[in-house]
UniProtKB/Swiss-Prot annotation:
N6-(2-hydroxyisobutyryl)lysine, modified sites: K127
Keyword match Protein biosynthesis: no
The organism's place on the tree of life at top rank: Eukaryota
Pfam family, one: 3HCDH_N
Residues found modified as N6-acetyllysine: K81, K87, K125, K136, K179, K185, K192, K202, K212, K241, K312
Residues holding NAD(+): G34, G35, G36, L37, M38, G39, D57, E122, K127, S149, N173, K305
N6-succinyllysine carried by residues: K80, K81, K87, K136, K185, K192, K202, K206, K212, K241, K312
Protein name (Swiss-Prot/TrEMBL): Hydroxyacyl-coenzyme A dehydrogenase, mitochondrial
Organism: Sus scrofa (Pig)
Subcellular location: Mitochondrion matrix
Length: 314
């Protein structure tokens, strides 16, 4: 009798999970974990397009800083969007801000959300532990998504019991301005989950593209090897960094040269990505670390944010 009861419970649980994954979700309520630049940007665009948002971080001070940054960003948007009607711009800012609440307790706010978007530190263990904990409190239908740019989505999904309702949702910086969103599907991501995230991205005014869970997805898989190859040209003495930048801007039509872009993104960020890929596939020639970049990072010369990278900034 006890065995039969356990089997029935398992069957009902399995049926419930299958039903949740088979159903397309209209995302109205969004929980964003991480109040940094990316998380705040995601919260801003979600709230500005009619979604109810809860922004979560570790302390009230961080959240206050995040909301202040969101307000400043919104006022810039309003100034341009409502140039002829400042009053309407003020109303837009206030309405958007009123749609964003904050919390320092993620577990207490995910029970009724439709979508959880994680945008915290790029650390597999930290992210996995977060998702494992939230999985116990989130509703059955809730979709989990990570904004990671370098970690494997499948590894994060495996920390939960909702692998079919788990995907990558990779925004680009600055989120309010950049139109692209990469929707990353693992082998377990259901078609309905994928469709739900594509639809959600469109409601944000973004252009979603879908891809498999491979290193770098689409943009970084093409961009990072290009940047590293530019550094190798420089390391070999084939050309100066200034001439390489000029060549790519004037010859390829790129708005920034590779060294300018590396300094803008952050050499520490690029090193983190390439090191992670190298760890996954050390034989891939595209994933080989750069001695010149490693040296700069070791000297805490990360680019524009530290005042010096490949170039010096005043």
């Amino acid at each position: 009798m006890a065995f039969a009861t356990r089997q029935l419970v398992r069957s009902l649980s399995s049926s419930s999970t299958a039903a949740a994954s088979a159903k397309k979700i209209l995302v109205k309520h969004v929980t964003v974990i991480g109040g940094g630049l990316m998380g705040a940007g995601i919260a801003q665009v979600a709230a500005a397009t009619g979604h109810t948002v809860v922004l979560v971080d570790q302390t009230e001070d961080i959240l206050a800083k995040s909301k202040k940054g969101i307000e400043e960003s919104l006022r810039k948007v309003a100034k341009k969007k409502f140039a002829e009607n400042p009053k309407a711009g003020d109303e837009f800012v206030e309405k958007t801000l009123s749609s964003i609440s904050t919390s320092t307790d993620a577990a207490s706010v995910v029970h009724s959300t439709d979508l959880v978007v994680e945008a915290i530190v790029e650390n597999l263990k930290v992210k996995s532990e977060l998702f494992k904990r939230l999985d116990k409190f989130a509703a059955e239908h809730t979709i989990f998504a990570s904004n990671t740019s370098s970690l494997q989505i499948t590894s994060l999904a495996n920390a939960t019991t909702r692998q079919d309702r788990f995907a990558g949702l990779h925004f680009f910086n600055p989120v309010p301005l950049m139109k692209l969103v990469e929707v990353v599907k693992t082998p377990m991501t259901s078609q309905k989950t994928l469709e739900s995230l594509v639809d959600f991205s469109k409601t944000l005014g973004k252009h979603p593209v879908s891809c498999k869970d491979t290193p770098g997805f689409i943009v970084n898989r093409l961009l990072v090897p290009y940047l590293i190859e530019a550094v190798r040209l420089y390391e070999r003495g084939d050309a100066s960094k200034e001439d390489i930048d000029t060549a790519m801007k004037l010859g390829a039509g790129y708005p920034m040269g590779p060294f300018e872009l590396l300094d803008y993104v952050g050499l520490d960020t690029t090193k983190f990505i390439i090191d992670g890929w190298h760890e996954m596939d050390s034989q891939n020639p595209l994933f080989q670390p750069s001695p010149a970049m490693n040296k700069l990072v070791a000297e805490n010369k990360f680019g524009k944010k530290t005042g010096e990278g490949f170039y010096k900034y005043k």
